[in-house]
């Protein structure tokens, strides 16, 4: 094959780690910061979107600050329930953004790692954490206002990769 296009972020210390695609073709890239300065890692974005205007990082919400203990580490990304979901392992959250980078909010999950869409994502998603798994059905709001979310206790925590075989 041949290279058709190449994309890079301006910050060479942002590592492109995990990918998810929305039905409209937008590609989400979960990021991991490799800065030697802890303050720069903490301030780093979690997500970049590849669309018609190229590859661009997505800012944190209006407050502009990353969640406490973020440490620049996104464990996974998936498309489900109309949202790109990113796991923030050290911050203990699953965070949501739209295909245009609008903040949708967050769901708490200690040690959040693997994210798996249910079906094609239209039915929601599952997230694995260090002590429990979270099942978030269609209509899930990242503010936690919709649901209901089901939580399952885990004998072992899940890492940052997973595939849902059945539910």
What is each stretch, according to the model?
Residues 29-30, 86, 126-128:
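Residue position within the beta-strands of beta-propeller blades
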Residues 24-26, 81-82, 121-123:
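Short coil/turn segments that connect the beta-strands within blades of beta-propeller domains
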Residues 51-54, 98-100, 139:
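Short loop/turn segments that connect beta-strands within beta-propeller blades
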Residues 1-2, 43-54:
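Beta-propeller blade signature
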Residues 7-12, 60-70, 105-110:
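Surface loop/turn motifs at the tips and blade-to-blade linkers of beta-strand repeat domains
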Residues 13-20, 68-76, 110-122, 149-167:
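Repeated scaffold domains used in trafficking and secretory/extracellular systems
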Residues 37-45, 89-90:
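Short, solvent-exposed loop/turn segments at conserved positions within beta-propeller repeat blades
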Residues 32-35, 89, 130-131:
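Short loop/turn segments immediately following the C-termini of beta-strands
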